[in-house]
Amino acid sequence: MITAKKHPLDNCQLFVQLKKLFHDYNEKVQRLKDMIYWSGNDEHIAKICDQVTDLLVEHDLIIQPPDTMDPCAMNHLRGLLVYLVLNTAHDDIQCESQWSANVMHLCNQLPPIPLFLTIAIAVNCCLMEPLEEFLACGPRWLTIQYFEAFNEALSVINSDCVETLPLLSAALRAAGRAIVNCNLPAENKQLLRQIACMEHRHILDSKQRLHTLPRPSTRKIYLAKAMDHLIEVLLYTLNDPLKREKPNCFAVYSQITEDISDSNSSDPMPDLRHFAQILLDVLQRIFQLVSVDTYMYWHEMKSKSALYNCQELICRQTAELLKVLQSDKLLGEHPVCKQMQSFADAAKTLEQRVAEMRIGELLAFIDSGMATNEELLAGLDNLFSRFIAFGSDECLETMANHLIMLTKKHAQIILSFLGQVVESEMVVEDEGISVTEVNQGDDEDETSSNDDYEELLSLVLRPLFMQLNVEDKMEVLLLRDEQNVTQGFNFKAPDHRERRIRFFNQLDYNKRFPITEFLVLCFENARQTWIDFSHLGVTHTRFSKLFWHIAQSCPKHAAFHISACADNILVNEQLLQKPYALQFTLYLYGHRQILNGLYTSARQLCVSLKDGRCPYGEDELRQAQNRFLDACAYGLAKFIEPMNLPSLQLILKLLKQISLGESNLITRGTAELNALEKEHPKLENGDDAPAVKVAKHYTYLHASLPEWRLKHWKLISHVMKTIDALRWDLATFEDFRVDNLELAVWYWQDGLSHLTFLGTEFRQRILNQVSKLKHKDFWIIYLKEDTLKDTRSFLKLLTQSSAQEANDLFNKLLKKRADCAVMGDLSDAVVKVNSESAFMAFRFLFREYLIAFRSHAKHNKTITKRQHWDHLMAVVAKAPFSIRNEIMELASKAFAVRFGINIQEQQAAKC
């Protein structure tokens, strides 16, 4: 195993062994300084290269055939090349004075090596990549010597013109990058002359020179390879050259000398264009050598691309290069562009090429291991576009083997396909097939299983989702919600429930929220994950804030599942008794406004009247309201039967808070709209400003909320049933029950008490519902005025009333001057029942009587205070004897001081 070398120029065992190798060869075989020319020293050069290769193999830096074995090896190889360069005999006799202090420890370690030997070792011992880096990043006074030596040695290194093309391309690439990395205009001219010389010497760009190759087929192959390499160099050099940063290895080679300069000119493009023109001139001459026969021959030739034959590859490269050249005014005018046009017109894009393949060929291409990343991605994109692949084991295996190449886009393609599957399986009722509804109350039954695509989910979609970043995960979850895919497929891992429970048990609002883990749980079962999160929200204000913070970070996804949280909480007795349940459920009612965005004004959170992160229209807002009110209705229905008063009380308080909250929302919204209209005057054509239009849209929606709510029949009917069930008599009275009745009646009276003004159809629905209720008396009053004719009617209503209803009844009795008689009848009824609940009921009703009496006495100025007091005492005298003193005390505390009565004197007078 290779140990990474952080600092390439540090001394190491490899350098020590290399030093021994060169000294031994210098002393025992051949003195290196006597090797002046390559010619005649071929055998020595080969032996030295073999020994260096063996040394690199020993250190696992290369393997046979010679390739870089591990990315960690590169720093070792870079250091080795610099080590050789520092010990090479250069033409510049002052070069030793140029070395920096950072590399002096490596100098004079070896006998002086001929420059051509250094190049031979680089080419033959897997140091070609470091050599290219050195030529691109090293000091120009030094690298120009290597360009010259490379030019001289190239044909000697390999006499095969085709095989020298990759080496030539490496030198050309390095030259192009050198102009950008170290932009030295004077030195660039020398470099450009050297490049022109190198191309002229080593590229067969004339008919005469081309015919030095013995066979026509070889000539056709050479032309293809030459074009391929030249075009690649041009693309590499001209594709956004100024946007590419210097490579990390630049620092390695910049340490060699003290005087290396990054740039003496701010703009390398003039010299870069000159460099490109030199290559384009050669390319133009090669184009002229391409006959129709050669072009057709290329069609049968394999290329380095697994996707294209040689002809197709050259056409595609030509199209890419032409596009780059035409983006530059000067280079776009080069004559070769006209020659390239016909090739570019015949080019096939990657997408076109993979689309031509049969699915078996496409799989073979993707799995071949020969495709570039760009080609591989095009192949995978095409595979994902063939929906038949999602049901094929072979295709799924190929997808799974290339997960690293897959992105959010591929996950979205899968979900869109699954959405189509779900839609196709949902047949309308008139076709005689019904769709099974999902049991919303059962965690484990949220999704049904579709075995045909189980492997697509487990092998591809799930691991693909895991590797996406947080934002992409949120987008994928949203698309899945929009496609309604969870209704037809099971996304859960076997241990999902255990992990979900553990996640929320360990969640700490003081620590950073583990959003990635949360989104994975949402992928497996979003509905239940949000429900469990909401269970924490009702326990503590900080968990509530955390819930809404996370919901606002993925608002559109959260909007799909928050209604389910309300469905769950409002039928859960334990959750409704949590300390923050009322406030949290109220937020759930307004979740569309919260998710769209809130703002702070005067230290208060206010609803925004503009399109935020989760805009909504009438349909979305009404649907969210209906779902929540349905949940309230279900809660009332569940808790009224066992008379679960604490749970009923919270739901009824919630309904009251909703009514008050809507009123506040409308008031604030109107004020904000007025301010916006002042800030944004009407346009010249008389239209409202865009911001005002949007604000009016939201103001109208918010103003519609009470009307929609009061027309929600399911809730109305259950409120009526709740009121009916909470009605009491003298045997069943209890304060808590009456408190709940008061809340229920308040909600009814807040918007629906004036039934005589309701529409005929709605009024009839109310009447039909009333006919099914046990206690119809109050409903008859609401429906028909002047139905109270005698004291018996009043008594019947009083002994089942809420506080407000009792107060209203006593006001009517006081006006009729029948209060004393009714209180007497009430007292008789209480005595007859003779239970604690009956006496509690009398106390309750008497307190309400005192409230009504206070109002009566305040407004009736025709009677003196003493007369009022005497009337009150007459009513007190009707109280049951066992609690009369208590009733007297209540009356005295309420009115003795007000009427100027001295209770002690009055009691003494009686005595």
UniProtKB/Swiss-Prot annotation:
Coiled coil: none annotated. Disruption phenotype: RNAi-mediated knockdown is pupal to adult lethal while simultaneous RNAi-mediated knockdown of all 3 Gem4 paralogs (Glos/Gem4a, Gem4b and Gem4c) is larval lethal; this phenotype does not appear to be due to loss of snRNP biogenesis. Conditional RNAi-mediated knockdown in muscle cells or the central nervous system reduces adult viability and results in age-dependent progressive decline of the neuromuscular system; knockdown in muscle cells becomes fully adult lethal due to reduced motor function when combined with a hypomorphic Gem3 mutation. GO terms for cellular component: SMN complex. 'Gaulos' is the Phoenician word for a merchant boat. This name reflects the boat shaped expression pattern seen in stage 7-10 embryos. Component of the survival motor neuron (SMN) complex that catalyzes the assembly of small nuclear ribonucleoproteins (snRNPs), the building blocks of the spliceosome, and thereby plays an important role in the splicing of cellular pre-mRNAs. One of 3 almost identical paralogs (Glos/Gem4a, Gem4b and Gem4c), resulting from a genomic triplication, that have some redundant function. Required for neuromuscular function and organismal viability. Component of the core survival motor neuron (SMN) complex composed of Smn, Gem2, Gem3, rig/Gem5 and one of 3 almost identical Gem4 paralogs encoded by Glos/Gem4a, Gem4b or Gem4c. Interacts with Smn; the interaction is probably indirect. This is Gem-associated protein 4a. It comes from Drosophila melanogaster (Fruit fly). The lineage of its organism: Eukaryota, Metazoa, Ecdysozoa, Arthropoda, Hexapoda.
